[in-house]
Amino acid sequence: MAVMTYIQAITPAMRDEMERDERVFVLGEDVGVKGGVFGATKGLQERFGELRVLDTPLAESAIAGVAIGAAMYGLRPIAEMQYSDFMFPATNQ
């Protein structure tokens, strides 16, 4: 079994799901060009484009709201919140 960090496991898992299912997309702060604060989405925007790897404003409640709404319509969003503490503002969604 390969030994890897969480980030090393998450990145290829997201890529594999995005290749397998066109309904999967990623949204969050700096997930596109910068590849996320920890690099979890590095290279995904180059591979899948800006429509499937979306940089969002600094608004966790908006990220959660968009993800919830997209899921209600059959899409498969991956909402990236930079830090666990930042999820609390999203709970009102």
Descriptions of predicted regions:
Residues 1-93:
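Thiamine diphosphate
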